[in-house]
Amino acid sequence: MGLCHGKSAAVLEPTVEEEEEGATRVAEAAAAPAKPASPAPSAAAAAAAPAKPGTPKQHKFPFYLPSPLPASSYKGSPANSSVASTPARGGFKRPFPPPSPAKHIRALLARRHGSVKPNEASIPESGEPGVALDKGFGFSRHFAAKYELGREVGRGHFGYTCAATCKKGELKGDDVAVKVIPKAKMTTAIAIEDVRREVRILSSLAGHSNLVQFYDAYEDEENVYIVMELCKGGELLDRILARGGKYSEEDAKVVMRQILSVASFCHLQGVVHRDLKPENFLFSSKDENSAMKVIDFGLSDFVKPDERLNDIVGSAYYVAPEVLHRSYGTEADMWSIGVIVYILLCGSRPFWARTESGIFRAVLKADPSFEEAPWPTLSAEAKDFVRRLLNKDYRKRMTAAQALCHPWIRGTEEVKLPLDMIIYRLMRAYISSSSLRRAALRALAKTLTTDQIYYLREQFELIGPNKSDLITLQNLKTALMKNSTNAMKDSRVVDFVNTISNIQYRKLDFEEFSAAAISVYQMEGLETWEQHARQAYEFFDKEGNRPIVIDELASELGLGPSVPLHVVLQDWIRHPDGKLSFLGFMKLLHGVSSRTIPKT
């Protein structure tokens, strides 16, 4: 792993030589063959800087990338400190034993990309011994006739990126970026599929101003060529360094609005990027106010709203805890965005260590520090925003659309919100819930703040209620199709929406929609959660609570005969009147099932 520390980024010059500790690319499942070495400009990165002479230092393990903010170049670096003198941070002490994922990731990466020599007993990844890999992609083979390659602007372990000029066609005379992936590097069936998927995602995602524009893909006998928009403004990382290592709050908001906007767009289409970091955001021009573009979809994948991915991918400093636990969705991108905004505001990484094991351990166990400068001088809203993204429980994290509604981002401005897929997931759960749980959620909805109601009202309007201010299943489908791209077909988002069949003959007003669209887990992530819960219980006690026997409660919750009901549920019912207790109310909000009941 690259040296990961919490000192100011202002004095940290990214170099390739700082790879001794590594900046490991944790990319088991979709490490793009042409992934450029950080911090060199990546796929569409044409900051127009000529390639530096010399060959980057090579390492025994071929999947290391340099740390974007190396530290050994200054005296106070943890790299130059003993373990004993390394400063503790938020109770985070060293040395740590390596966490369980660390050792396995290298082996998985090596096997995936064919860098480990197979032994005699190994079976080719294609599943059939001795079967040659098909490296034909069906792309056009007329690249040389249409484009003239120029200087190299970035190089990774599996390919390189060049500036190029279009010789004919609609783009004649225009400069473009070309990601060149040698077929010789595609030594496994998975590596080949990674390239196919990257092109498919780039070609199917279109229409967002903060997404790098894809033009075409070509191939010949030796290479695959991915032609994209040329971004000449450099990386977000370069801008951070140029500003002395961090952004002001106001400038950070401008950056975050763009990042959240494109993230929400991708997530609605069912695409998770899986490698969001400052190096993968480029500015379209050198102008200070130029648009920012997300690039490098080499690790991206399609994900259905109710599906969990299990490939360990990403860059170590930005990888979410659930990725290391091998069960994640689009929430993993929100964690990465949380790391980015932490860096923007203070110039330090929230999770740092001297080794890859330490980084993983920090991500899994440590809490980010808000005690060191400049955090005490930053607004409470900024700190709350970061905390709600860097919550280790992915269920409590904000979505990109919700983050755009956060008081720190929105301020007094009217922000145009995108449709949020979490609304569909929550509505499906609400419709299939018991009548008692729906009553509990309606009580909770009455405690929502103005900012929370603003978000829900915007989502309600995006779904498109009828003249009576009611929404139906058809409204849900129509709203989704208005925002769809070809990526939705691969991610099967529409198939998921079709499963919300129970609402087919129902119409929801805004009050019930608010109850249906509440995430109890996200509410729990608020500092004011206990106040919400107590107030909601008071509403529920007046309007929805009623006497209930244990057997009926078990039926309401769908608990099976294997659950010792009287032992488990006796504290959930008040003995004086037989109504739900506060504990029972809280359990009901979470939708308790047999799987969540502890065994006795």
From Swiss-Prot:
Keywords: ATP-binding, Calmodulin-binding, Kinase, Nucleotide-binding, Phosphoprotein, Repeat, Serine/threonine-protein kinase, Transferase. Residues 74-85 have a biased composition (Polar residues). Residues 1-99 are annotated as: Disordered. ATP binds at residues 153-161, 179. SUPFAM superfamilies: EF-hand, Protein kinase-like (PK-like). One of its GO terms (biological process) is intracellular signal transduction. Autophosphorylated. Residues 24-56 have a biased composition (Low complexity). Coiled coil: none annotated. Belongs to the protein kinase superfamily. Ser/Thr protein kinase family. This is Calcium/calmodulin-dependent serine/threonine-protein kinase 1. It comes from Oryza sativa subsp. japonica. The lineage of its organism: Eukaryota, Viridiplantae, Streptophyta, Embryophyta, Tracheophyta.
